[in-house]
Regions:
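Extracellular loop-to-transmembrane helix junctions
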Residues: 4, 33-59, 141-142, 262
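Membrane-embedded translocation segments of transport machinery
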Residues: 2-6, 166, 170-318, 322
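Transmembrane helix-boundary motif of multi-pass solute transporters/channels
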Residues: 10-48, 233-239, 250-253, 257-260, ...
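Central hydrophobic cores of alpha-helical transmembrane segments in multi-pass inner-membrane proteins
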Residues: 24, 44, 49-61, 71-73, ...
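Inter-helical loop and helix-membrane interface segments of multi-pass membrane transporters/permeases
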Residues: 3-4, 32-36, 66-91, 104-162, ...
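Membrane-interface "cap" regions at the ends of multi-pass membrane proteins
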Residues: 1-27, 56-61, 65-90, 243-247
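Hydrophobic core segments of alpha-helical transmembrane domains in multi-pass membrane transport
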Residues: 45-54, 93-118, 145-159, 174-187, ...
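Alpha-helical transmembrane segments and their helix-start/interface "positive-inside/aromatic belt" motifs
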Residues: 11, 38-46, 83-101, 166-176, ...
Length: 329
């Protein structure tokens, strides 16, 4: 039986970018950039993407294309007799499972918050800190939303590569990109936009001296590897679905550009909004589920913008869940 292939180059790029684009682009990259010298961090990050990220990504795609398999079988297919490279395949698959456990849970939170904004459960008088604490304290609510995400991902993957994974992820990613552009434009119209963009992108020499240039280099390198989801072999499965007529380095560059665009736009959304309402930025879950709801409380049409933001986040997380699940199965 002939192995399925992507129906279009756009489908391949969008689903591969969907695997790379995730919550780390939103709740980690802007905060780390702002706290590590702003523009200097962004420049170093892009340099390391060029030096290490794109070559490693291209290598994973090449291994997938050469073996026509996902990570475990790929190493068995490509290694020479007596070699032990397949051990990394098993370690990589364990990493994919851990990533899936994490993402299905957090994706459920995103979906739950989107529905809360749509139904009006979140208002200007809502205590965002207490609301998030209540969500964490209720395992049944978390289980229900996680189960919904898992069910959606399983249904999409069961529909096959072209009719399921490629088709649905392509629409999700196009909507995601549209949403992030709309949200970024809105943030740039706020009063604190200039101050926020300066904090995010202009090199801060005082911050560089405070943090240390060596530490900034390490953080930029860490983010470059983290953002592309390389190292666990999650990109191999997508390489296995493309033909030899594709230039893998070129495809890797396209994927990296999309991932970087979302990371930069996330900073454009977050910093102007936080600076406009004098709300300190944070990282991790507290940024998404505590800090930003406070921003939306102060914002005109906050319920609408909150719903749009959490729809964007749900698509970003769900695209990764679908991609990782496709790699596992």
């Amino acid at each position: 039986m002939e192995r399925e292939k992507f129906g279009s180059r756009l489908g391949f790029i969008l689903i591969s970018a969907g695997c790379a684009i995730g919550i780390g682009n939103v709740w980690r990259f802007p905060y780390v950039a702002g706290n590590n010298g702003g523009g200097i961090f962004v420049l170093l990050y892009m340099l390391f993407l060029l030096m290490f990220g794109i070559p490693v990504l291209s290598m994973e795609l090449a291994m997938g294309r050469a073996s026509k398999s996902s990570i475990i079988r790929a190493y068995h297919e490509l290694e020479r007799p007596g070699q032990k490279w397949h051990i990394h395949g098993y370690l990589g698959m364990i990493g994919n499972y851990i990533l899936l456990f994490f993402y299905t849970t957090v994706s459920g939170w995103m979906l739950g918050y989107f529905i809360k904004y749509v139904t009006g459960d979140i208002t200007k008088n809502t205590d965002s800190s207490q609301m998030f604490a209540d969500v964490i304290a209720n395992p049944w609510i978390m289980f229900v939303w996680m189960a919904v995400i898992v069910l959606i991902a399983v249904i999409v993957c069961s529909m096959g590569l072209q009719n399921g994974v490629e088709k649905i992820t392509k629409y999700m990613m196009l909507i995601l990109l549209g949403l992030i552009i709309i949200l970024a434009i809105h943030s740039l119209t706020l009063d604190g936009a200039g101050k926020g963009m300066k904090y995010f992108l202009v090199p801060d020499m005082n911050k560089i001296e405070e943090v240390g240039f060596g530490n900034i280099i390490i953080e930029a390198m860490r983010q470059a590897f983290f953002t592309l989801s390389v190292g666990m072999g999650s990109m191999m499965i997508f390489g296995s679905y493309i033909g030899k007529e594709r230039a893998l380095v070129g495809e890797g560059i396209q994927i990296t550009l999309l991932d970087t665009f979302v990371a930069i736009m996330s900073g454009v959304i977050i910093f102007p909004a936080c600076m406009s309402y004098n709300i300190p930025t944070d990282s991790g879950p507290s940024l998404i589920f505590v800090t930003l709801p406070k921003v939306f409380e102060h914002m005109s049409g906050g319920r609408f913008w909150g719903a749009m933001f959490f729809l964007f986040m749900t698509f970003a997380a769900l695209s990764t869940v679908i991609a990782v699940l496709e790699n596992i199965i």
